[in-house]
Amino acid sequence: MMNFRQRMGWIGVSLYLFVSAAAFYYVFEINDTYNKLALEHVQLKPQEPHRGTTWTHSLKARLLSLPFWLWATLFLIPYFQVFLFLYSCTRADPKTVGYCIIPICLAIICNRHQSFVRASNQISRLQLIDT
């Protein structure tokens, strides 16, 4: 039997995936402005910048010239973090909520490594008695 937190977790996961699919469809199929901006970016630009360009135009031009893998990384890491957090809310054990978030995951891994080193040091100090 699912409790309230699990039900809300599944509702959150389904809404998150639905909104993601709708945004993906909007950006890549419907939005003509995005297509125009992509075409303007590809067209040849004059070598000498116009004197009337503002810092926002130059910033936009520099940001649009960044590689695709960088943009994908910047958007996908937070996207997957939110998704994995919502998915962890669907677990039956409330202590496991949030373990898949990167800072928490790194803290747990480091803590396990330190406890493993302590345990191995304690075992090496013990003397085995042969009977």
Swiss-Prot record:
Primary localization class, coarse: Golgi
GO terms under biological process: lysosome organization; regulation of vesicle-mediated transport
Protein's cellular compartments: Golgi apparatus membrane
InterPro entries: LYSET
Membrane topology according to the record: Multi-pass membrane protein
Keywords noted in UniProt: Golgi apparatus, Membrane, Transmembrane, Transmembrane helix
Pfam family, one: TMEM251
Domain of life of the organism encoding this protein: Eukaryota
Spans traversing the lipid bilayer: 8-28, 66-86
One GO CC annotation: Golgi apparatus
Similarity annotation: Belongs to the LYSET family.
Function: Required for mannose-6-phosphate-dependent trafficking of lysosomal enzymes. LYSET bridges GlcNAc-1-phosphate transferase (GNPTAB), to the membrane-bound transcription factor site-1 protease (MBTPS1), thus allowing proteolytic activation of the GNPTAB. GNPTAB is involved in the regulation of M6P-dependent Golgi-to-lysosome trafficking of lysosomal enzymes. LYSET is thus an essential factor for maturation and delivery of lysosomal hydrolases.
PANTHER family noted in UniProt: LYSOSOMAL ENZYME TRAFFICKING FACTOR (PTHR31925:SF1), TRANSMEMBRANE PROTEIN 251 (PTHR31925)
This protein's name: Lysosomal enzyme trafficking factor
Organism, scientific name: Xenopus laevis (African clawed frog)
